[in-house]
Amino acid sequence: MDLMMALKRVCRVLLFVTQMYVFSGRGSLSFEYSQPVAQPLKDTFPSSTTATSIKATTTKMPEYMEICPSNGQCSRLASDCMTCATNYSCIYGKLVTFNCTAKNGVVCFDENSQRQEYFTISMACQFCWQLPPSDYVCNLSSSCKTISCPRQRYNTTCTVLDHVHCLGNRTFPKMLYCNWTGGYKWSTALALSITLGGFGADRFYLGQWREGLGKLFSFGGLGIWTLIDVFLISVGYVGPADGSLYI
């Protein structure tokens, strides 16, 4: 028994000494633990400075390019497609020639298919507001009365057609007579006045429902009102209630 106890004590002492030796670092295992090498990650996203410096550049096309033909004759270009050295010292109504150049981006040729940068155009010496009405278009108004005394006028803005050349501003103000139609026919109104005027059909057709009701319940004013309306419509004195002209 004593021998066994002695062996246990010796084993405990050896175990204690072995543990102390290992903990002191001299008896550490010889395995080498490889440390992972940190590889620098490449940033695949551009920095904020680079992102702001990269911008999509868009080229804005001039407005006149929409009406300027490509590879056409220079003499047929619209006025907005060329720049001409005009002067106001010409004689009104006379034919005058001006030197012109095509605007940037406009390519044109002469009659021999040769590209031209400088060319001439001929036009009548007159300002744009002096052109005949067929050479410009105006903004029409439907808020005025066509049947009035004196005849009503209104102010509007007119623009010269693209192919017409003139001096001065191509957009100008103009005073026009009130002249618009709402779709009423003079022949229809006159026919209704002759045939059904006693029932006020002509007045109802023209949009004058109050007068139409008066004629309807008075049987055309016993025929007198009917005869008067036939005369007034025939001479154009009575027209549509909206103030428009007959077709």
From Swiss-Prot:
Q: Which residues lie on this side of the membrane: Cytoplasmic?
A: 201-215
Where, per UniProt, does this protein localize?
Answer: Membrane
Main location, first listed in the record: membrane
Q: Which domain of life is it from?
A: Eukaryota
Q: Among its keywords, does the record have Ion transport?
A: no
Q: Which PANTHER family match?
A: BETA-AMYLOID BINDING PROTEIN-RELATED, TM2 DOMAIN-CONTAINING PROTEIN 3
Protein name, entry field: TM2 domain-containing protein 3
- Higher taxonomy: Eukaryota, Metazoa, Chordata, Craniata, Vertebrata
